[in-house]
């Protein structure tokens, strides 16, 4: 979740490979392990690459797709439309998907954007637009996923002082709570429908076995 230099880079764009890996980790463990593969048709996602199993498994499940059958473009920043499409494929709940943004009519991902919005994964801007071709930052992605998982601490008192902190995620930043939530493994108790209060920090899952 963080980088080797100790930063978390909340305002950096999130890549297609990073997004695939996030949703790979959100899979039910039985589904993830039952479909785990390191094989794919992409020439730019190969054996030994850190994201190979994540991308390969998610492609096998049909949740992510390449630019073409041979090109995944793992390091490219993901757009809001591409992110919405992954959300819409990942979440199998039924919805009518009637959310209508003013700038998605005729867009290649119009149906998936509407579905992802109806499911609560994504939201538009106050002016009624979705801006499908804009890139998503790491902080925005964390916030969206936390919201859907109903994992939203409401203030600093809901956190624990011994948590991992980041020099580029300050308490005054709009994304502070979302980033702390997404980057610290912990137990918690509920506060309302979507809020939570941390009760204990826990060891982070060992994801290296999937690299």
Residue ranges and their predicted role:
Residues 1-17, 24-52, 61-81, 89-111, ...:
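Feature responds to low-complexity, polar/acidic, surface-exposed segments characteristic
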